[in-house]
């Protein structure tokens, strides 16, 4: 994980005599490591997110320092602390350097020579370690609750960790499923994976860190935004998704918060190419297992409807289908109800299935069906006659119409995961 630079500065500026002289708008950067650098040649070893400390021992002039800072910015470090009083003084920080840091939102701090670099780095390393350990412990415990809710041994290990950090076994929670931040197409599971027990379909996908994830930039951006706005979300990261878990709140508030996150991610990263599914509120902590399935299903629905986010509560009939673990039962129902029409269309190169669907939607109105299909009323009458006489559909029977519409809904549900 990482620490918000603003929080770090606020908590330690007095202890180490830190003075922020430029780049204040960049205090919302995340700091994931501390790195001591005196040589621009070492910048190639940086990964991004480091807080750099330098004494400027190799600094020969203002141009050297300017280019050094420019290189740090290009390598996406989060800020620079200059240890002044030995090799560099406050007067060596030119207006040109300050303007560069302000323009690039790159925090530049001065630290007195009396502050020992060992002390500040030791402190910051410990903070990073503690933050990482805490985040991983919570994420691992939540992963076990989601993946193995019926494993009493794992629950006995996980629940005390969650209690320690504010989670309650009887509290309600929302789970927010965010599709793969790299490629939303890869989020799509098979129907069996989604409806079969989560223990079988997802046993290897949840992890507790951001490492080895091509979408780490956007994931870290999301982390930063959540911390900036002090939102009550806990992260669990998988190989192709990110989960946000929060105390249950109103859908209106969730939508407002998530829409804002999407907006700022689009502004910062130039993309909003992700889909978000929000579960129904759980009955308790163990309910996060079912909430995972709900969130993923809702994210798929968001993708299908080309919408940024979708609530499981709005999935209507699909909410019932998600509880069916045997997908073959659903396929058989579709085949028993619509199979003869599908076969007829394949053999005769026709589209009576769509005509039937529009017939049900339009409540049998020939005029409305013709408008929906962009064809003449006589054509519709002919097709309806085929459905009645050749395909033996009792279209006037309410029970038959209900079964047909149900089959269409199931067919659409299966198509969602195909």
Report residues per predicted region.
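Cytosolic nucleotide-utilizing catalytic cores of signal-transduction proteins
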Residues: 147-418
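Gly/Thr-rich phosphate-binding loop signature of adenosyl cofactor/nucleotide-binding cores
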Residues: 1-73
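Long, charge-dense
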Residues: 100-146
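Short, glycine/polar-rich helix-capping loops at beta-to-alpha or helix-loop-helix junctions
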Residues: 91-97
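Short hydrophobic alpha-helical runs that function as membrane-insertion/retention elements
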Residues: 52, 78-86, 99, 105-113
